[in-house]
Design a protein with these regions (language model features):
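Long, compositionally biased, intrinsically disordered segments
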Residues: 3-167
Length: 167
C-alpha cells in the first residue's frame, strides 16, 4: 500500500522567454519537494495538472488536457543537498529530499493584473503540526501584469537556492 504523503512543499517559478506587442511567453516550472525517507510512500508523480487563471477576471486559461487544465510531465528529479546547519542544532536530523521539476511553456495575453498558476495535491507529510488535518495543499505562483510590470516586459520570478534548510 502506497500513500501520497511524500510531498513536503512546492515552488512555482517562471522565466521570461519572449514577447509580442500583445503577449508574453514564459517557461513556468512547478518544483515539488519530496521526503525520500517517507515509509511506504509513492514516487514523484509522473505528471501533474495545473490551472492558470487571469487575475483580471478569474477566467481559466485553457490548457492541453480535459477540463482546461495543463497536464505537465515530470522532466527531471534532482537530489537536494543539506544547507549549512546553524550552530544551535545539537542533534543533526537525518534528511533526504529531492526536487521534481515540471516545466511547461505558456504564452499569455498581456493584461493588467497578471495571472495565478495553481497546483493542488491530496495529501501532506506525516506529523505536520501547523494544520489540523492532512487533507491536501495548494501551491500558487503569480505572474504580474501591466499594472506591475509597466514597460518592463522581461520579468522573471525570484528563485531560491536549492537545498534543505533545517530551521
Amino acid at each position: 500500500l502506497l500513500f501520497a504523503r511524500h510531498i513536503t512543499g512546492a515552488e512555482d517559478v517562471y522565466e521570461f522567454v519572449s514577447s509580442t506587442p500583445s503577449t508574453r511567453t514564459y517557461v513556468v516550472t512547478l518544483i515539488l519537494f519530496r521526503d525520500n525517507l517517507c515509509v511506504n510512500c509513492s514516487v514523484m508523480p509522473p505528471s501533474v495538472s495545473m490551472g492558470v487563471f487571469s487575475n483580471d477576471n478569474n477566467a481559466m486559461i485553457p490548457g492541453n488536457s480535459t477540463g482546461g487544465y495543463w497536464n505537465i510531465a515530470l522532466s527531471t528529479v534532482q537530489a537536494l543537498s543539506l544547507n549549512a546547519l546553524p550552530n544551535c542544532i545539537q542533534n543533526v536530523p537525518n534528511l533526504s529530499y529531492s526536487g521534481g521539476f515540471y516545466p511547461f511553456t505558456i504564452t499569455l495575453p498581456n493584461n493588467n493584473n497578471g495571472y495565478t498558476i495553481t497546483y493542488q495535491t491530496c495529501c501532506r507529510i506525516e506529523n505536520i503540526s501547523n494544520t489540523t488535518d492532512l487533507m491536501g495543499a495548494t501551491y500558487i505562483g503569480q505572474i504580474p501584469g501591466n499594472n506591475t510590470l509597466g514597460t518592463n516586459l522581461q520579468d522573471n520570478s525570484p528563485q531560491f537556492s536549492r537545498g534543505i534548510s533545517v530551521v
